[in-house]
């Protein structure tokens, strides 16, 4: 394949995942009130780490790397938990929890086959649904212009946000292939241009940003560790691994490569290493991006060279704050419109997982009902368990942790019950037959 074609296809992969890669640091940074300089650094270092994480996964060796043409980017599943952790304990606590969850993935990658039975679709589907629903209020606030903004809910903000949402919907309705894959990115560009004509774009951060910068490990301070935060991010890591497994299997079929348990172990370990790197570099947990799988199907090009090129492009972009500062031009309302579509898709992903189970089974419905309700309840009323001992509050202070544990425990309870009933029923049948 010609080098020019490899470079072009590499840029396509970068464009397909670019919106997802930059929107996570933008949302988290904006929610935690970072200034323009900090936001620009957060976005640029995230692009850099996305590139390195991708290269770690594509580079197959004895210890890590699945060796498939897969792109890694920030996981949306972690957005809500990171905002909650940052609001409660500060940015260093985010990186402490990301570091701990990354170590967990890297060290116990070989045991995920055994852990998977505790995280069937009814558990992972409930967790992803809870995470998606708890993110929606963040998107709605931004649609209005951002919490506390003087023009919150103004007609101009609503026109921008709903205009972007409509653009994304129409792009998915009337286009397929690559255009559909970058519909979010196109929506952000469209909304920013419209916002500029409405006087809602400030080019100051772009002008102030330098063209190149160095890397500053622990830019936001040395990681701090808090058990509730670590538990939350570890659950997020497990859910992300379950999602990645589906992407790995899909890519294995596309590339006609039969995956072994050892392949999956190296893939999981790479995600753990990427998260460890993310915590050191002031970035986020990483997971495989399914939109790039669709791009491989569209282009019919299965070469790892294309994805390796995309990884190096991201690394180069990560050293250029001026490129990252372009994302700071996006008006908050525009971001909110895109977030509605993106976070809604997180909810849809959770519902899709739940679609794999028997919804005619009353016990399954009860598990979903209780876990989602507990998760949302704790999110809405976080002080509900303030009078409980600290050792218990660790497990109940976060809606995602509380809802996830509810799903895990209820699934275990009903699964054990069903096995015992089945064994008793089988014994009774044997006695009757005798």
Curated annotation (Swiss-Prot):
Q: Where are the transmembrane segments?
A: 9-29, 39-59, 63-83, 93-113, 118-138, 159-179, 181-201, 218-238, 306-326, 327-347, 365-385, 394-414
One MF term in the entry's GO annotations: xanthine transmembrane transporter activity
* Keywords, alphabetical: Cell membrane, Membrane, Transmembrane, Transmembrane helix, Transport
Provide the topology term for how it sits in the membrane. Multi-pass membrane protein
Q: Which InterPro entries match?
A: NCS2 (IPR006043), UacT-like (IPR017588), Xan_ur_permease (IPR006042)
Q: Do the record's keywords include Transport?
A: yes
Taken from the record, one Pfam family name reads Xan_ur_permease
**Gene Ontology CC annotations of this record:** plasma membrane
- What does the entry report regarding how activity is regulated? Inhibited by the proton gradient disruptor carbonyl cyanide m-chlorophenylhydrazone (CCCP), but not by the sodium gradient disruptor ouabain. Hypoxanthine, xanthine, cytosine and uric acid act as competitive inhibitors.
Q: Where found?
A: Cell membrane
Q: What does this protein do?
A: Uptake of the purines adenine and guanine, and the pyrimidine uracil. Transport is probably proton-dependent.
Hey, which family's this protein in?
Belongs to the nucleobase:cation symporter-2 (NCS2) (TC 2.A.40) family.
- Please state what the protein is called: Nucleobase transporter PlUacP
Q: Which organism is it from?
A: Paenibacillus larvae subsp. larvae (strain NRRL B-3650 / LMG 16245)
């Amino acid at each position: 394949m010609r080098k020019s074609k490899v470079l072009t296809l590499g840029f396509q992969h970068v464009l397909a995942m670019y919106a997802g890669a930059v929107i996570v640091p933008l949302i988290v940074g904006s929610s935690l009130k970072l200034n323009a300089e900090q936001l620009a650094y957060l976005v640029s270092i995230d692009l850099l780490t996305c590139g390195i994480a991708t290269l770690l996964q594509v580079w197959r060796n004895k210890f890590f790397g699945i060796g498939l043409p897969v792109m890694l980017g920030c996981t949306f599943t972690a957005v809500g938990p990171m905002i909650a952790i940052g609001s409660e304990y500060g940015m260093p606590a985010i990186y402490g929890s990301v570091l701990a969850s990354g170590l967990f993935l890297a060290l116990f990658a070989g045991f995920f086959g055994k852990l998977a039975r505790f995280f069937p679709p009814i558990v992972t589907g409930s967790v992803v649904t809870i995470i998606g629903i708890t993110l929606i209020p963040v998107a709605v606030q931004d649609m209005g212009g951002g919490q506390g903004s003087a023009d919150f809910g103004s007609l101009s903000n609503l026109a921008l946000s709903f205009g972007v949402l409509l653009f994304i919907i129409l792009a998915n309705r009337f286009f397929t292939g690559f255009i559909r894959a970058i519909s979010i990115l196109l929506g952000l560009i469209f909304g920013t241009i419209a916002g500029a004509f409405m006087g809602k774009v400030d080019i100051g951060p772009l002008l102030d940003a330098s063209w190149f910068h160095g890397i500053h490990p622990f830019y936001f301070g040395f990681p701090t560790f808090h058990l509730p935060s670590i538990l939350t991010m570890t659950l997020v890591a497990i859910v992300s691994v379950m999602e990645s497994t589906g992407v790995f299997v899909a890519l294995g079929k596309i590339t006609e490569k039969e995956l072994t348990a050892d392949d999956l172990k190296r893939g999981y370990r790479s995600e753990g290493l990427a998260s460890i790197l993310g915590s050191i570099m002031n970035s986020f947990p990483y997971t495989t991006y399914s939109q790039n799988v669709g791009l491989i199907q569209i282009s019919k090009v299965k070469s790892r060279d294309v994805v390796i090129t995309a990884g190096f492009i991201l690394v180069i972009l990560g050293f250029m704050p001026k490129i990252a500062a372009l994302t700071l031009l996006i008006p908050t309302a525009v971001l909110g419109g895109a977030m509605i579509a993106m976070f809604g898709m997180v909810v849809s992903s959770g519902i899709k997982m739940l679609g794999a189970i028997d919804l005619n089974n009353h016990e399954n419905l009860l598990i979903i009902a209780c876990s989602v309700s507990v998760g949302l309840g704790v999110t809405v009323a976080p002080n509900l368990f303030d009078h409980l001992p600290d050792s218990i509050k660790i497990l109940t202070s976060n809606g995602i942790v509380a809802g996830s544990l509810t799903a895990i425990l209820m699934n275990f309870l009903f699964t054990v019950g069903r096995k015992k009933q089945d064994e008793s029923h089988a014994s009774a049948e044997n006695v009757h037959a005798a």
